[in-house]
């Protein structure tokens, strides 16, 4: 496969107004995507966004480019990323487009695409779009231009979809749940789903102003929801990220339950009910404790590259359904075509009710190995992973840990970061060797 010029592991992402995330580029991207999609069926796409203020500007630019290529557009407004995947299928669209930078700050934004079946766009289609980007932009004839319409009932459709993934014989009545929507795209969705299923809902992170998405709230900033769960004596907490494709949970003691533990709980419930297809897929970053816990249950476990698109690819290759990442991307292909934070949370709630256990009790089935993750920022053009001192530091750590741990060093697919991960059966060793490697990376970048 050719190297990608614009698309990263999760679409196109960057700082608003710079490089790729500006009106001119995004209009051209819309046109190029329209050229690739044109003539393939309905000539219709849908566009949704999170709550960043730049979403309005980028939505208009995409709309203009797509229209120039003869594509009709359905505008969803603020909607979770998994909702756009689902609605792409239900509206029989050629593609769904998401304007979001997920868990990043408000000044970043991005564009990613879903195919007609609600899955991430294939690599060859992304490459075809990139090829069109290098051609001069030309409008179709005036009578062939696309039109845009606002879709009024999108939120209600998705709320019903979420509720449909919760067993009809179960109820959340009697449960007190804190839900943190990160001032993001789920702010008008998740509280309604939980309350309509019977829960008492306490909301935080549900007042977006265009600038506060992911700011000290949500799945990447857990203090707010931990404090709220304890303050309100809630049974558990849901923490979603800005676009709703990942979730972290909090038990009634205030312990954070991460994506690896969520995958374990969902897989265990599926196994107990006879619905587990084969095994489970994690990534090279998944905690060794997940692999050990699943092995105890007799469940096979495979690791993919980091990124939910690669988890999805391996699930499809294996014919399995359940997988995810520690960061809270959780997939269950029996329920949704992509990672869905709300649906994953509902599946954990169903597992609790089926087992008549608290979240804390369920999570004890998996013992996490101490894992230290350090992110080191690097400048464009630097190649710290090629530095001999960095390579030597990794070899030293691997030699010292032996079979008691593992080391992973990788470049982020979405940000200029080197991710240093060390896992060991002893927390002190994990921290010591992660710091050792991170120091070598910092020196290699001139820090």
Curated annotation (Swiss-Prot):
Post-translational modifications: Activated by phosphorylation.
Gene3D superfamilies according to UniProt: Alpha-D-Glucose-1,6-Bisphosphate, subunit A, domain 3, Alpha-D-phosphohexomutase, C-terminal domain
Swiss-Prot/TrEMBL catalytic activity: alpha-D-glucosamine 1-phosphate = D-glucosamine 6-phosphate
Swiss-Prot/TrEMBL GO biological process terms: carbohydrate metabolic process; peptidoglycan biosynthetic process; UDP-N-acetylglucosamine biosynthetic process
The UniProt record lists the keyword Cytoplasm: no
Keywords for the protein's UniProt record, in alphabetical order: Isomerase, Magnesium, Metal-binding, Phosphoprotein
Active-site positions on this chain: 102 (phosphoserine intermediate)
EC supergroup of this enzyme: isomerase
Modified residue annotations for Phosphoserine: 102
InterPro entries: A-D-PHexomutase_a/b/a-I, A-D-PHexomutase_a/b/a-I/II/III, A-D-PHexomutase_a/b/a-II, A-D-PHexomutase_a/b/a-III, A-D-PHexomutase_C, A-D-PHexomutase_C_sf, A-D-PHexomutase_CS, Alpha-D-phosphohexomutase_SF
GO cellular component terms attached to this protein's record: cytosol
Cofactor binding note from Swiss-Prot or TrEMBL: Binds 1 Mg(2+) ion per subunit.
Cofactor: Mg(2+)
GO molecular function list: magnesium ion binding; phosphoglucosamine mutase activity; phosphomannomutase activity
Protein function: Catalyzes the conversion of glucosamine-6-phosphate to glucosamine-1-phosphate.
UniProt similarity note: Belongs to the phosphohexose mutase family.
NCBIfam families: glmM (TIGR01455), PRK10887.1 (NF008139)
Record-given protein name: Phosphoglucosamine mutase
Provenance organism: Pseudoalteromonas atlantica (strain T6c / ATCC BAA-1087)
